[in-house]
Amino acid sequence: MRPASEVERRRLNDLFAELCAIPSPFGRERAIADRVAGDLTRLGFEVAEDDAAAGTGAECGNLLARIPGRSDRWVMLCAHLDTVPHDGAVEPVLVDGGWESAGHTILGADNKAAVAVLMAVAQRAAVEGCPIGVELVLTVSEENALAGAKAFDVGRLRSRSGFAFDHASPVGEVVVASPTYYRLKAEFHGSAAHAGIRPEAGRSAILAASKAIAAMALGRLDAETTANVGSITGGVGGTNIVPEHCAFLAEARSLSDTAVETAIAEMVDHCYDAGNDPACECDVDVDVERLFSGYRHRTAAPGVLAAEAALRACGYEPRRILTGGGSDANAFEANGFPCVNVANGTERNHESSERVSQAALEGMLDVVIALLDEVAEA
């Protein structure tokens, strides 16, 4: 397949801006799902929505669209429709050759850059055909611990492997390892008392939680492992009350299952140790959930080699990277379906300064087109 034409590049940019302007925080993807499904249907492709909404709480399910190819082989291409929550409308604007949000909100390039690219591939295929059958999987609630992809039934796929395009780093990078991720919720239940008259009668839940957090190893624990406390709530607002309740949310993640399990176990121990401290004795409830599992691709994994070949064909020097972030690829890999995550050139995802250059957006389109050729010829 030839590289994208100037007309295709212009259409890609226009479509990207239109998609970014459609609000789609996780759980509220109906509007963008309807837009994308409608466009694919008008192109003549079969589109189906699954029942993931029932389990994820989203407004709609995942979309699966099939684009027939000139061979009887198939490959899956994945992007997610949702974004992180945001306030206010998104107004995409071009600044110095790149797309940004005009306001103080996210742009939504995560992952609408990939959605736009896959839609551009579908537009090309509708006119010129495709060397291999393509299954587009457009998921919901990726930003909610990969909920949509985890609910997707990979048994519906004709493909034997696939690719996601959901890493905020320069085009050319290929993710070869991603972490296992645990989330911890700790609640401390003490007893209230007047802080100025009878503080001895109270048991401070905030003090207990603080001691637990202070004892934890947080930040980068080693080259492959991180831990963080992300939020804490407690007390009733008055400084004259010994607080009887406090809770916090934390996480640990690592490319090593052994390391992350050790880290999360130590965090749990610190919670109970703090609850047993005579200075702030509290009842402690700790809930730990494994939200997704990690993976590490083999050196000669076919998907990795195909991605690298496609990148070289487009003039990029491939670079294999390890990441501390998760993507739908984690969910597919956990379900036994090989999936390689390829960087999409976006920058500063989840921030008001989020950006993607036109060069990166258009480059990804060329890479995906080349990738279909590589997979078809493999």
Predicted regions span which residues?
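N-terminal capping segment at the start of a domain
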Residues: 1-27, 290, 347-351
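Metal-dependent amide/peptide-bond hydrolase catalytic core
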Residues: 4, 42, 205-378
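A non-catalytic alpha/beta surface segment that caps or lines the substrate-entry region
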Residues: 25-72
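Acidic, glycine-rich active-site loops and adjacent beta-strand->loop/helix elements
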Residues: 53, 81-83, 137-145, 167-169, ...
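Catalytic-core environment of secreted peptidases
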Residues: 63-109
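Alpha-helical metal-binding/catalytic segments enriched in His/Glu/Asp
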Residues: 77, 96-143, 182-188, 198-219, ...
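Glycine/charged-rich beta-loop-alpha catalytic/anionic-binding loops adjacent to active sites
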Residues: 92-105, 189-193, 314, 346-350
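Acidic/histidine-rich catalytic neighborhood of metal-dependent amide-processing enzymes
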Residues: 103-179, 221, 226-229, 234-240, ...
